[in-house]
Amino acid sequence: MKRYSLVFLIMAVTSASVAQVRDNRFNSSSDFTIDYHFFKMQTGRPIGSTAGISISPDGESIWIFDRCGADDCVGSDLDPIMQFDLDGNQLKSFGSHMFVRPHGLHIDFEGNIWVTDGEGPDDEDPRRDGIGHQVFKFSPEGEVLMTLGKPGVAGDGNYEFNQPSSVLVAPDGNIFIGDGHGGASNSRIMKYSASGEFLLSWGSRGSEPGQFAVPHDLAMDSGGRIFVGDRGNNRVQIFDQQGNFIKEWPQFGRPSGLFIDDNDMLYVTDSSSENRGPTGSPNNSSPYAEGVRIASVKDGSVTLFLDDPHENGSQEGIVVDKAGNIYGSLTAGKALRKYLVR
């Protein structure tokens, strides 16, 4: 069997025990060798909750969008955007004092960095005032090239967002944004031109085809189809670039992160199917185990399931390099570890 190297950003560095298989629907891999020291942070720099992870178009570096060593960046002097080489060495960082709660991260075909700020002001912390609910485009050197959304404004206009979760840039430069993260936020996909001009939007809150309950992540296959991780509805939805619904796949649990490689293989992370409340009962209706599912975009048939050994799941972002190594990020984490799956 092909060997996969799976890298996670997670909190506890306590056990290298093999995960138990909890979902026998698919081929499960549970024999892990764990490396807790793959990503090498600058001296004294902690890693925080991390939803965003992406890879450069040349496949030579990994970018991470963490929450400034904590659960958000409010009041922090740390840079949340970080670049690493494929040996795990940190190369650069930038973006301090710009974000409330870092969320989505995407590297476009020119190597520019796109990020979403998933929260904004509240009534309790004045340090949040005037920032949040935006999407930024950076050069690889950290220069701001474009800003979408109004700073600190949660709205539903054509140039406003409310908790944007994800961003994706097509080969022609058009920009797609998954706008919303549950609650009272939006539930839609926004499309803009390469210059930031609004083109169209689709979606509303609900569970029908074309509706969303947390459009958490976006990916595009070689045919140009848009894949949406509709986490709150326990499904992946597929659209054309005009927002026309094509199909939906429920076999990926609660999809938090999506990645499609050069071979049109789809990688989906499920971070919350087994989350449980104070009574011990599931917080959602998904019957699946948490982990990574790998499938072809042709038919969605899952060929490999990597069970999540972390007790509370929270695996969100995922990318794969050209050698087939898999890298992922967790929001319940403040440490690094690497899995070699045999």
PLM segments and residue spans:
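Positively charged n-region of N-terminal signal peptides that target proteins for export
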Residues: M1-Y4
